[in-house]
Amino acid sequence: MKISQAVGNACTVPASSVETHNNNPSKESKIIYLPGTNCEIKSQALLSAFTSYRVGGAAELYVAPRNIEALQASLRYAQEHNLRVTTLGAGSNLLVSDRGISGLVIATRHLRYTHFDHQTGQVTIAAGESIPSLAWEIAKLGWQGFEWAVGIPGTVGGAVVMNAGAHNSCIADILVSAQVLSPDGTVETLTPEELGYAYRTSLLQGSNRVVTQATFQLQPGFDPAYVTATTKQHKQMRLTTQPYNFPSCGSVFRNPKPYSAGWLIEQSGLKGYQIGGAQVAHLHANFIVNRGGAKANDIFCLIRHIQQEVQERWSILLEPEVKMLGEFQAA
């Protein structure tokens, strides 16, 4: 079993299944109940509703566990059936193929809890919690250290995996530890050093582990009004420099030091360039937006076109920050 990173009662499988309605008669749709949990695996579940691009086909199998036990059961099911596993958080850094994804997609959006330790200044957060919502909650408590994250459009799990960052700060700066599950359901706790953090990446990317929660070191005891005001400044900066009026995945490419990917794309004359419903944003060239009716393959072809144009002009091959899942067809 391979796991892709865009988590009671341990159950045993076999699981029972029943037939359900399927809009695609060429593919059988079913629900698989995992014994010992309130969890069910659905087949042929459309993923477009769960990605920020609002594109993508169906997952061969899809599950959204509500607790660690159900997540462990889902992983065991995948292991016993030799299924590839893809972990889905907010879907904000993903491009899912129009053809969908094979294997089991595990959505962590229902794994939600937050625990503040007011003595140590540490906060432990479940993988499915929203980063922007947390930034506001933490600011209102008067805790510093998370203000920069208010504009990160994702969940804690995804942010830990990709070392999300903004405003010269990143997850690695404040992470104490991350709790992860291995394919057999074993719980591990890893430090930032063990995660091998680098710019917008970690050893979790492409690994066989799923993040369930993370603990961060913050600084309590500040004026909530001051921290909230700083958080608002970070949010306003992103609103004025990044497109929020159309669906996107956030930044498409990593910045190739010492350059900005957006600057290279803009200087290549690509602002506003469009393929199908996918367009290079006018406000920020490192964003591709869905202007309406875009297909995942439109976005994929636009990514490839940008890479070709920038490499031809600057001899720099831009590396995608967005993770592409499934099969795509180049134009």
Swiss-Prot record:
BP GO terms, sorted:
cell division; cell wall organization; peptidoglycan biosynthetic process; regulation of cell shape
Q: Which domain of life is it from?
A: Bacteria
Q: Which cofactor does it need?
A: FAD
Signal sequence, renumbered to the chain: none
Query: In the Enzyme Commission scheme, what number(s) does this protein have?
Result: 1.3.1.98
Q: Which residues form the active site?
A: R200, S251 (proton donor), E321
Pathway(s) where this gene product acts:
Cell wall biogenesis; peptidoglycan biosynthesis
The main enzyme category here is oxidoreductase
Localization: Cytoplasm
List the catalytic activities from the record.
UDP-N-acetyl-alpha-D-muramate + NADP(+) = UDP-N-acetyl-3-O-(1-carboxyvinyl)-alpha-D-glucosamine + NADPH + H(+)
Tagged with keyword Flavoprotein: yes
Q: Which residues form the FAD-binding PCMH-type domain?
A: 54-221
User: What GO terms are given for molecular function?
Assistant: FAD binding; UDP-N-acetylmuramate dehydrogenase activity
Entry GO CC:
cytosol
Among InterPro entries, the record links this protein to: FAD-bd_PCMH, FAD-bd_PCMH-like_sf, FAD-bd_PCMH_sub1, FAD-bd_PCMH_sub2, MurB, MurB_C, MurB_C_sf, Oxid_FAD_bind_N
State whether keyword Cell division applies. Answer: yes
**Known role:** Cell wall formation.
Similarity comment = Belongs to the MurB family.
Write down what this protein is called.
Answer: UDP-N-acetylenolpyruvoylglucosamine reductase
Q: What lineage is this protein's organism placed in?
A: Bacteria, Bacillati, Cyanobacteriota, Cyanophyceae, Nostocales
